[in-house]
A protein has these predicted regions:
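Hydrophobic alpha-helical scaffolding
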Residues: 7-10, 101, 121, 138-142, ...
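Glycine-rich phosphate-binding loops that contact phosphosugars or nucleotide phosphates
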Residues: 293-435, 439-442, 524-527, 531-564, ...
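Gly/His-enriched, cation/cofactor- and phosphate-binding structural elements
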Residues: 11, 30, 38, 222-224, ...
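Glycine-rich oxoanion-binding loops at beta->alpha junctions
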Residues: 68, 72-85, 276-290, 313-349, ...
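Conserved short alpha-helical segments that host acidic/polar catalytic motifs at enzyme active sites
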Residues: 1-249, 253, 262-297, 335, ...
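Active-site phosphate/pyrophosphate-binding segments
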Residues: 263-267, 271-299, 389-518, 528, ...
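Glycine-rich, anion-gripping cofactor-binding loops and their flanking helix/strand elements
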Residues: 183-208, 305, 331-365, 506-540, ...
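Generic C-terminus detector
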Residues: 230, 545, 571-612
Length: 612
């Protein structure tokens, strides 16, 4: 959730830190700050509540803070209100240490009470200040920065990505990680620390992803990594492939619109390398046909939009594989005592590969003997590293908080997994398989065709942005699609929205429908189109304004009943959500635009949720 960036080199640190934090703004935050070691070996800490611009103005773009080593932080409040005092970096009582932190120190109350009993005075309400004060406490005992860090790590419990500065050791940053993302960047005569590669790709593409329990010492001469026993270790370096421009708006007013428009290319990258001669081929999959045949149960585990991908996947995989498929919210899975064993395949879906709840669910499933296949976007992320198998979506960086192209590519990869496994199991008809593979190859072009309806969607959004409640209804795949459409609308436009299975209308939901209520009726799934139409008639009879989404072949019939119709090209039934989501993304975007919302950075939301 929080953004972290650190720099050790020969250039002025503050402008580099501010630029890095600006590239992390998409993660969401309520305050920001930097700590820079001055030429006189003093810690200069500047922080403020609000947008990063306020911090930049405070330090005149970094010109007021001299020094070539420092750290920056953007904070989402968890412990303590969002204000200047609770913002990071936090400084120890005598000003010797500065700390930035992403995560939650679970035993901070106990540690705080101990330190207070030793005469330490606290300034903030945060859990993070405990780390700074504890560092100084142990440093006063042993006089060694690295040893003090080790002692602190042995005392604290919970999740953390930590960056630490010591005024007595002005040539280094020490970093530590447990259950929160942190990576190291290697440059010529400089070193970098970041929670996300986006912050430092302008300066280096050579990175190492830290694992739990590791400590890193960053200096101008390089970075030394240590394991939890404080023994030196060497790790594989990763080269970031995507371009800096991929994390910039490229002329679009918002990252979200840019990423919606990038979906044809993103899908092409995810699909094309895996289609050969009418077959789906996963060169990067270690699973053997024998192992696939051994699975008698499948769990799909995810959060947010990735969970909605899983909902679509449940319908498609059960149909294709004739296996029981369950979809679980990661935050619930680990506490639900799931029936998981060595004959269970657990498919983990995550854009960032760092979502804490999803990581915890992965570890719980692994502990019970399950085989873990993850579908992630970020190469080398924690989930990717801890899985038995990983399939990358290759969508490129996604900056807007509301996911678009990550959802589309996750769905495409999951559909390909279903088809590939069904072919191995012999549970899919040859003609159905061949048709789906043909349509997969055409999917990027059909998404591009769907994006051509922007003007029509924008006009309809301009007529309906005033609604305070919007309901999505659909059956089967359309219900799963409605869940994602509803989430998109509520998270960026702040309109109350719910998605309901159409067959449940009479069981209570229909009491909410009255004159002028906006209902978005999803009728793309051909086998249940007549059922969808009967539900449309029901809500129209109660005065609803109905915006329908259907296929081109059903447009004429739907238009006879509803107020407005959006269409997508016809395709294989299992792929319809991949097309249907595009108009819903655009509708949400244009509604939020009409309402003047902060589309790329919705209030109270973070791109990657790395705390419970």
């Amino acid at each position: 959730m929080c953004g972290i960036v650190g720099y050790v080199g020969s250039e002025q640190a503050a402008p580099i830190l501010l630029d890095g934090l600006a590239r992390l703004e998409y993660r969401g935050y309520d305050s920001a700050g930097i700590a820079v070691v001055s030429p006189r070996h003093e810690l200069q800490v500047k922080k403020t509540v609000g947008r990063l611009k306020a911090l930049s103005d405070l330090v005149h773009g970094g010109a007021d803070v001299e020094g070539t080593i420092g750290m920056g932080h953007t904070r989402w409040a968890t412990h303590g209100a969002p204000n200047d005092v609770n913002s990071h970096p936090h400084v120890s009582e005598n000003g010797k240490f500065a700390v930035i932190h992403n995560g939650i120190i679970e035993n901070y109350v106990e540690l705080k009470e101990f330190l207070i009993s030793q005469g330490v005075t606290f300034k903030s309400e945060t859990d993070t200040e405990v780390v700074a004060q504890l560092l100084e406490f142990y440093y006063n005992e042993c006089g060694d920065f690295f040893e003090s860090v080790g002692r602190v790590l042995r005392r604290i419990e919970g999740a953390y990505a930590l960056g630490m500065l010591c005024a007595d050791c002005p040539d280094r940053i020490i970093a530590a990680r447990k259950d929160a993302p942190l990576l190291l960047g290697f440059g010529e005569g400089c070193s970098f620390l970041a929670s996300d590669a986006t912050a430092i790709i302008k300066h280096t593409r050579d990175v190492v992803y830290m694992d739990d329990g590791e400590i890193a010492v960053l200096t101008r001469g390089g970075i030394q990594l240590y394991n939890a026993m404080q023994q030196p270790i060497e790790k594989e370096h990763h080269h970031i492939e995507w371009e800096v421009s991929a994390a910039e708006k490229g002329g679009y007013p918002h990252f979200m619109l840019k990423e919606i428009m990038e979906q044809p290319d993103a899908l092409r990258h995810a699909i094309a390398p895996r289609l050969r001669g009418g077959e789906i081929v996963f060169d990067d999959l270690k699973l053997t046909p024998e192992k696939i045949r051994s699975f008698d149960r499948i769990f799909i585990v995810a959060c947010g939009s990735s969970y909605h991908v899983g909902m679509v996947g449940k319908y498609n995989l059960e149909h294709l594989l004739r296996r029981n498929v369950e979809v679980a919210l990661a935050s619930e899975f680990r506490y639900s005592d799931p029936i998981v064993d060595d004959k269970t395949l657990v498919i983990i879906i995550s854009q960032s590969g760092e979502t804490l709840d999803t990581m915890a669910a992965l570890r719980e499933a692994k502990k019970r003997g399950a085989y873990i296949l993850s579908i992630v976007n970020v190469v080398g992320s924690s989930i990717a590293r801890e899985s038995d198998d990983v399939l990358y979506t290759w969508a490129g960086p996604e900056i807007a908080v509301a996911t678009t192209k990550a959802y589309s590519t996750q769905l495409a990869v999951l559909d390909m997994v279903g088809l590939c496994f069904a072919k191995i199991l012999g549970t899919v008809r040859e003609e159905e398989y061949a048709d789906a593979v043909r349509e997969l190859a055409l999917l990027p072009d059909k998404v591009k065709e769907t994006l051509g309806h922007c003007e029509d969607i924008q006009k309809y959004a301009a007529q309906h942005f005033h609604h305070e409640s919007v309901f999505f209804i659909g059956r089967n795949l359309d219900y799963a699609l409605g869940l994602e459409g509803s989430l998109k609308l509520k998270e960026i436009s702040y309109i109350h929205s719910e998605a309901y299975a159409s067959g449940e209308l009479k069981h209570g939901t229909i009491s909410l429908i009255e004159d002028g209520t906006l209902v978005i009726a999803l009728g793309t799934y051909g086998p249940l189109f007549d059922k969808a139409m009967s539900n449309v008639v029901e809500v129209k009879a109660r005065g609803a304004d109905v915006l329908a989404l259907t296929t081109e072949s059903h447009c004429g019939e739907m238009a006879k009943t509803v107020d407005h119709v959006l269409t997508v090209p016809d395709t294989a039934a299992m792929l319809l959500p991949s097309l249907g989501v595009v108009p819903l993304q655009l509708f949400s975007y244009y509604i939020a635009l009409q309402r003047g919302c902060d589309i790329d950075k919705p209030r109270n939301l973070a791109k990657s949720v790395t705390v419970e």
